[in-house]
Amino acid sequence: AGQNLHVVEGDICDAALLDKAFHGCNYDAVVHLAARVGVRPSREHPDLYLRTNIDGTFRLLEAVKKAGTPRLIFASSSSVYGLNKKLPFSELDRIDQTISPYAATKLAGEQLCSTYAHLYSIRTVCLRFFTVYGPRQRPDLAISKFTRLINEDQPIPKFGDGSSARDYTYVDDIIEGIVAALAYDGPIFDVFNLGGSQTTTLAELIALVEKALGKRAEINQLPEQPGDLPRTYADVAKAGELLGYSPAIPIAEGVPKYVNWYLEYMAMGAGGN
């Protein structure tokens, strides 16, 4: 770590640790990325998701309030749109039909952030991320899982008929959006979508990974999973107008970039993702 970086490892539900992390520091802003993530595991361990994503966010907001930190960025999720059938998803669309514990906790996090923003004048931006991918991404996500399994000549799980679609967003574009949000001086509380603004079906994604690896996938066909949205698609017009956000890396470019990184990472003997 450099002289301007101090790393504190711990649990955001630990109020004492948060007090220590904020003690004597006049932070310009807090970017809250800490969370338990993933729709499917949230069905198996909803208690852990409620603890981290709701109680943890509450405790962090308390620490921000006590420290007088003027600005907060909260990483939310496209999953809050739930059963919304209108495409693309707009920040003005209904968000009262979440279909997973994970989505419910992210929506609760947004509401907590709104409350603290208005009560304590913490300028807050909630960013709804759409399926972020790229180097060092979570190993349970489709792109990293498919890359590893196809590369190792193992079957990949394919849920449903392959028509489900996601708006995949390369991590570099997400970072650009976060940096822009840190400089945003709009309302005391606001919400933006950050996505790639294009949809890719599961079948198309598998084909992209196959092409990047130069290998065909062996398919383990499985039924659709409850809680998974059939399609996500970000309307990023608001972020474009007010943040200058413009996703630059389409999925056809991003998947090969990720696969190349993965192969180089494995060649260094790193093992896993």
PLM region descriptions:
Residues 1-132, 245, 249, 261, ...:
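N-terminal Rossmann-like NAD(P)+-binding domain of SDR-like oxidoreductases, especially those catalyzing
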Residues 108, 112, 116, 146, ...:
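Hydrophobic alpha-helix immediately C-terminal to the catalytic Tyr-X-X-X-Lys motif of short-chain
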Residues 1-3, 91-95, 120-123, 147-158, ...:
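A short C-terminal helix-loop "cap" of Rossmann-like NAD(P)-dependent dehydrogenase/epimerase domains
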Residues 17, 58-63, 168, 173-180:
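Conserved mid-core alpha-helix of short-chain dehydrogenase/reductase
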Residues 150, 178-182, 206-209, 236, ...:
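Hydrophobic "lid"/C-terminal helical patch
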Residues 171, 191, 203, 222-250, ...:
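Conserved C-terminal active-site "lid" loop/helix of NAD(P)H-dependent oxidoreductases
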